[in-house]
Each structure stands twice: as structure tokens, then as C-alpha cells.
């Protein structure tokens, strides 16, 4: 199963609002927010958590997992706001009801398409995990192994620092 998420790929967001406008045009209501933190702007979208706190607190079961994604049934939602409070990312927006990213129902996400700074990207979660793993393995492979004679190896530094000095 291919699971996709929208992630922020750089910190070039200038709060132009193009992603929010595109989302509103496509979905009738904005499902993305832009947060400002220390002079940087960060687009906030649902991360479709595997163990979604928003789903757990919904008193009317308006939120469900399906095919690896978190869906909110706006027709069932009563607008209590508990899901918005429970979301660790602040990705559920409240008006009369709760609204969250639905990844444009499988189409290319409007926010990703509209971002002129290329801050947002739709990624395959598995590819992202494997890319991070490969990067870590590459870094480890460049470290000196304990059997190699090198004062620069990570193991050498740890053992030298750990020795008791007279």
C-alpha cells in the first residue's frame, strides 16, 4: 500500500498564502494553515497519524482510519473541537465544524501545486523512510571501524574519553 503525506521540504515559505487560497478554491474551505515561529513560516497540514489522537477523542466517531489515511466525515462532525485540541500538529481547523487535509481526494494536492517556493511536496512515506535509512547507513559506512587504525573513529574517541586518567 502506498501512503503519501505532504511535507515541508524547505524553510522558504514567505506566507504568501497561495497554498491556502488554492486549497480553499479546491475544497471550498481552507484545510491548511500557516504558522509563524521565530520569523519563519511553516505550512501545517494533517500528517495522517498511524495512531491519531483526533480519532480517539471524537465523541461521534466522525474520524476514521481508512487505507492508512485519517478521514473526517464532516456530515457527522458536531463541531465540538476536541479533535483540534488533540491534534499534535495543529492541523485540524475549526469553523462551524472541523476541517482537515484530505490530500485532495487523490488528485495532485492544490497546495503543493500552488506553492511557488516549492516548500511543500507530496511524498511516498515508504520512500522517505528508506531514503533516511540509506543516508544513515551511508554516514555509518564512512566512519572508521574499531578494527581500523585511526584516531578519528567514533569508537576510538569514545574509548579514549572513557579511559580513567591517573
From Swiss-Prot:
Keyword 4Fe-4S included in the entry's annotation: yes
Originating organism: Methanocaldococcus jannaschii (strain ATCC 43067 / DSM 2661 / JAL-1 / JCM 10045 / NBRC 100440)
Listed GO MF terms: 4 iron, 4 sulfur cluster binding; metal ion binding; oxidoreductase activity
Pfam families the record matches: Fer4_11
Residue ranges annotated for the 4Fe-4S ferredoxin-type domain, each copy included: 3-33, 37-67, 68-97
Binding site for [4Fe-4S] cluster 4: 58, 77, 80, 83
Obligatory cofactor(s): [4Fe-4S] cluster
Gene3D superfamilies on file: 3.30.70.20
Cofactor note text: Binds 4 [4Fe-4S] clusters.
Residues reported in the UniProt entry to bind [4Fe-4S] cluster 3: 46, 49, 54, 87
Binding site for [4Fe-4S] cluster 1: 13, 16, 19, 115
Name of the molecule in the record: Uncharacterized ferredoxin MJ0265
Domain of life: Archaea
Residues at which [4Fe-4S] cluster 2 binds: 23, 101, 104, 111
InterPro entries, per database record: 4Fe4S_Fe-S-bd, 4Fe4S_Fe_S_CS, RnfB_subfamily
Keywords attached to this entry: 4Fe-4S, Electron transport, Iron, Iron-sulfur, Metal-binding, Repeat, Transport
